Swiss-Prot record:
It is found in: Cytoplasm. This is Vacuolar protein-sorting-associated protein 36. Keywords: Cytoplasm, mRNA transport, Protein transport, RNA-binding, Transport. The GLUE domain (GRAM-like ubiquitin-binding in EAP45) mediates the binding to the 3' UTR of bicoid mRNA. Belongs to the VPS36 family. SUPFAM superfamilies: PH domain-like, Winged helix' DNA-binding domain. Residues 111-144 form the GLUE C-terminal domain. Residues 1-94 form the GLUE N-terminal domain. GO terms for biological process: bicoid mRNA localization; mRNA transport; protein localization; protein transport to vacuole involved in ubiquitin-dependent protein catabolic process via the multivesicular body sorting pathway; regulation of apoptotic process; ubiquitin-dependent protein catabolic process via the multivesicular body sorting pathway. GO terms for cellular component: cytoplasm; endosome; ESCRT II complex; late endosome membrane; neuronal cell body. Disruption phenotype: Multivesicular body sorting defects, with large amounts of ubiquitinated proteins detected on endosomes. Bicoid mRNA is mislocalized in developing eggs. Ubiquitously expressed in the ovary. The keyword Transport applies.
Amino acid sequence: MNRFAYVEARLSPNESFVSRDNRVKIYDGDQKTDFEDGEVVLTTHRLFWGRPGEIARAAVTLCLPLSYVISVSEETTASNFFGRKTRIIMHLHPPTSDKGPGPLDTSRATHIKLSGKNGLSVEFHSALRETLNARVWEILLTSEIIINGVASSPTLEPANDRLARIQKRTGIGGIERHLEAKAKATDENIALAFQDLSVLMAMAKDMVGVSKTISSKIRKQKGEISDDETVRFKSYLMSLGIDDPVTRDNFTSNSAYFSSLARQICEMLLDPIEEQGGMMSLADVYCRVNRARGLELLSPEDLLHACEQLSGPIRLRSFPSGARVLQLESHDDALIAVDTLEKVEAAESLAVEELAKQLGISLLLAKERLLVAERLGKVCRDESVEGLRFYPNLLLGRD
């Protein structure tokens, strides 16, 4: 990011507009920046990035001279539930001494990334490569040398060839070639869309089942869905996906990767864990997280390492039975025991499966809740041929 400078978004003499794209964010190396959802404009000499409307007003925006660019490459990442999006990686020369002030004075990164909500357009990517190959900023300098009488130098021939190629883009022939390239890009977009559609069709059945399950749960609470429940239903659907999942490729060390992954898991699961009574088994966590990450699936080992680093409102807990859960930090054993005792007293006695059905949790979590209450003396068990049941501990009421 220390190659960018703040300049007014105005074309200089002999500079021409080439292409633009919207909703673009910039990465400083592999790290995210605050420059998101902006408009990027490519000219023959520079690359501009500004907030929506800033470039049109000729306001002060970020500007990267194309002379800094060494090469361009791509990386492909997952896009929400299905499909993939492409990021552009621009490898850069060190900043020159005459560079103006910009967003950063120093940066260890030797490249930047441009990423869109659903990937950058094929047209923009193609225009960027053609512009960098043409190197018009060098051609204009060469033209000045030619005017000054040194056109006979053999070192100028490659630049003249490039100038001729640029000139071929003008006129009726240039317009026809541009329309042909645009039609080809449209065909590629349609082909990619059909690939995404096939993935969507394969997942549609599961998605419809999930939405029906959520809807039926809300309808069981009341006869009709209120406005508050509609908002809650939308929040359920929003929780099904992660816009930009944390991946190992963006980090140079395992500790930074697992720390960032732990923060994302905490943000994603805080509300669902609260709604499930303060605990969620690791099996449920694994399913929820990977369903939300789409194609960027986590291994069980990575998930466990990330959960072990949780230190905020959620923490990893191991029960004496060996079961592991994510539990709210404020949800200690005393609260679990009191809440479980209330459920047992209301029903006079409860089996594990009855408590699981009543709270809408797994059998594993229901059993651990009853065992916690038993260890604290709130309930006592009765094992018989009919199975295991828990009763209120009547000795607590004696003086």
